[in-house]
Amino acid sequence: MIKEKDTPKNEVIIETENLNLFYTDFKALNKINMKILKNSITALIGPSGCGKSTFLRTLNRMNDLVEGIKIEGNVIYEGKNIYSNNFDILELRRKIGMVFQTPNPFLMSIYDNISYGPKIHGTKDKKKLDEIVEQSLKKSALWNEVKDKLHTNALSLSGGQQQRLCIARTLAIEPNVILMDEPTSALDPISTGKIEELIINLKESYTIIIVTHNMQQAGRISDRTAFFLNGCIEEESSTDELFFNPKNTKTEEYISGKFG
């Protein structure tokens, strides 16, 4: 059972200012101004190709890996522009973690999947690593299912378990924000329900931004929702307001299924 959503804090953790993104000559994002509240779940919805996943990847500079990208404007995280020349990108990606659409566990044991990140960031003590692995798996609601087989290959897990493992792997490096790009689209309804419940529980300690094509999912788990269309935010407000009292005609048409 998914517990009732709590009201998020009013503290802004990420803010974008006139954010534009170009793929060579194509403008994929157009003047995105948005505030993300701390300890909130923000859903990004919209039709395929609207820019929501592109926007998500600007928040921890994953788009830097794509050739031909040009970005204008600011992304302010905890008071600093992440696109400034002296910003530590590795530290950024530790603080703003990412969970992808398809579960992507490393080809190694469950234990090594979780301990890999902390080791990279300097944790070598075995007792400390054991503690991180256990706590990360508990936070991702996977510990009881895998505690007796930590040294088996992670690929032996089911799809839903693999996705929770990927979430645990992200938690192990102590992020503040977790970006999720359609994390349940490849999962069955039971596994999807477990991930949704997990996301709501994680909000107590983390800020979550999730891209989803599933509007029912956005309604179930998110505090705020932004509707993207043609690289712009058409409307952004509390989830209840956007779904039940949309101000924009295009928003109403999209959520009523007139296009998608």
Curated annotation (Swiss-Prot):
It catalyses: phosphate(out) + ATP + H2O = ADP + 2 phosphate(in) + H(+). The keyword Transport applies. PROSITE patterns: ABC_TRANSPORTER_1, ABC_TRANSPORTER_2, PSTB. GO terms for biological process: phosphate ion transmembrane transport. This is Phosphate import ATP-binding protein PstB. It comes from Borreliella burgdorferi (strain ATCC 35210 / DSM 4680 / CIP 102532 / B31). The keyword Nucleotide-binding applies. ATP binds at residues 46-53. The lineage of its organism: Bacteria, Pseudomonadati, Spirochaetota, Spirochaetia, Spirochaetales. SUPFAM superfamilies: P-loop containing nucleoside triphosphate hydrolases (SSF52540). One of its GO terms (molecular function) is ATP binding. Keywords: ATP-binding, Cell inner membrane, Cell membrane, Membrane, Nucleotide-binding, Phosphate transport, Translocase, Transport. Belongs to the ABC transporter superfamily. Phosphate importer (TC 3.A.1.7) family. It is a peripheral membrane protein. The complex is composed of two ATP-binding proteins (PstB), two transmembrane proteins (PstC and PstA) and a solute-binding protein (PstS). Residues 14-255 form the ABC transporter domain. Part of the ABC transporter complex PstSACB involved in phosphate import. Responsible for energy coupling to the transport system. SMART domains: AAA. InterPro entries: AAA+_ATPase, ABC_transporter-like_ATP-bd, ABC_transporter-like_CS, P-loop_NTPase, PstB-like.
